[in-house]
Amino acid sequence: MDSARPSRIRWAAPSPFTAVSPSDPTYPKALVDYCCQEFLIRDGQVMQVYEELLSLAYWLRGFSPANVLEIGSAGATFFLLSRLATGRKAAVDIRDLRSRLQLFMFGHDWCFFHGDSHSEATQRQVRSYCDAFDLIVIDGDHRYGGVKEDFEAYREMLSSRGVIMFHDVDPDHVFKGGAGGDVWKFWQDLDEGTKTLLCCTRSSGRVTCQGESSRFGGIGIWSPR
């Protein structure tokens, strides 16, 4: 792991999550609501359409992944994935977010890799930690070539039941070509395996991004089978 100085923390730590037992049917929603606290949204820790994140949480509850990997991590989403996973949890980011993520992940077994997800060195480190992930989230480099590179490299680390999740695949993404990048285009061009699209066209506005309450996300789930 890179020894660079930790990122400066600009916000207070969220209080520990103890609201609902994991056995409670409302556990996924409680996790999402915890992630969508106003100060986390304001600081950019949550950039997901609320209804998409909520639907994803219930899907994850049913899928019940063991090992999970997130490429491009802000904190809140990684916390959600990790709480609904039963095995190893890993995150990769070109920014050093260890101090920030530690506030969400305190007391949990997890690993953060500070480096370029495209580099062979980073990929070797991830593989040495775990070489079979049930869920890999690609939400880092949003350029077409960057998304493709992450997809080609990390698909080799999928377990026999593993899937890859992409964020920002909404074909009508309000920021596509800009902050939303070209993920939607890569998703559109991906013509192998099976694809499931989760896209909210009308939202309650619980989470907003630059004044938008919907069409700034879109979740795509890809399976090689």
What are these regions (language model features)?
Residues M1-V137, D141-R225:
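A short alpha-helical cap/connector motif
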